[in-house]
Amino acid sequence: YGVWQTPTEYVNVKDCVVWSDYARAIVVGPEAGACIWGSGGLTDCIFEDCVVLEQPDGSTDYRAALSVVQQQQSIWGVTYDEYNGNINNILFKNILIDDIQSGGRPIWVEQCRPQKEWVGWQWVGVSFENITIRDTKGLRHKSYITSSTCGGMYVSLTNVTYNGEIITSTGKYLDFYNKSGMAT
């Protein structure tokens, strides 16, 4: 296993309309590094100048308009730590999340760890810049960031607005959950 694993690098998605009326919209990970998928990690991915329409469901796991997830994957029911991939330099820029549905969630970021420590996992630089969230149906599910601090986690939100209000910290529009007690 893992012989064919190569990283996915330098992906640029620009000027797209993503209509997510049934499924997840833009998800980075979570299969990065799982050899059943043949991937070795994700580096230098940019999603810019896009519109995400009608995000329908965000009540569980990482169903959101914009999502970055690093988690352990199994191969036919067996888990191999050495096949988990790094996530580095992921940028969402100038994105409009419009007309969120009654169960929708704008953003989900998750780094999760199983029972034992992962060795060598990296997560560096996940950024959200100039994200506009329009919700005419009322706040449903907050954006959510959760960490197990597997190999470091840096997430930045710059000029992220919800119905015109800038999100500057946790509260009405954003939750942060730290599973390990180590991240801040």
Task: Say what each PLM segment does.
Residues 1-184:
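Extracellular/periplasmic carbohydrate-active domains that bind, remodel
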